Amino acid sequence: MGFWKFLPFLVLSFLVVYQAGMFQAAPFRSALENDFDPAILTEKEMCLLLAAVMNDYVQMKTSELKQEAEHFHITAQKRSCNRATCVTHKMAGSLSRSGSEIKRNFMSTNVGSKAFGQRSRDLQK
């Protein structure tokens, strides 16, 4: 139903734009009428043209590299996290790596699965 309301508006706007002269075609030029001939360029003009092409190419490659660097930076930011779970995992990893040093420096507290069911007289031996 909405299409039938839109169609007359579309046709009317097309006619208004056509009458205003917006849809006039550009004059057709054949390839033979082209004024640009690379054979008649001077050496200075060729150097300027080459420099302009190279400058555009370098700018294009620079913008592509910046976009890739931004994408890499975004993925690196996603990996680094400061939430409590991430910090806990980092601390657990550092504790597991330094576990042997902790066992050497501190005495055992007799807590855990090995201490379950032991009596106080067994612990005093």
UniProtKB/Swiss-Prot annotation:
InterPro entries documented for this protein: Calcitonin-like, Calcitonin/adrenomedullin, Calcitonin_gene-rel_peptide, Calcitonin_peptide-like
Q: Does the keyword Secreted apply?
A: yes
Location(s), subcellular: Secreted
Which keywords does the record carry?
Cleavage on pair of basic residues, Disulfide bond, Receptor, Secreted, Signal
Tell me one GO molecular function of this protein: calcitonin receptor binding
By its UniProt entry, which SMART domains does this protein fall under?
CALCITONIN
Under Pfam families, the record lists: Calc_CGRP_IAPP
One Gene Ontology term of the biological-process aspect is: adenylate cyclase-activating G protein-coupled receptor signaling pathway
**In the record, which residues are listed under signal peptide?**
1-25
Looking up Gene3D superfamilies in the UniProt record yields:
6.10.250.2190
Q: Which GO terms describe its cellular component?
A: extracellular space
Question: Propeptide positions in this record?
Answer: 26-77
Disulfide linkage: C81-C86
Q: Which family does it belong to?
A: Belongs to the calcitonin family.
Q: Which PANTHER family match?
A: CALCITONIN GENE-RELATED PEPTIDE 2, CALCITONIN-RELATED
UniProt-recorded name of the protein? Calcitonin receptor-stimulating peptide 2
According to its UniProt entry, this protein's organism is Capra hircus (Goat)
Its gene is: CRSP2
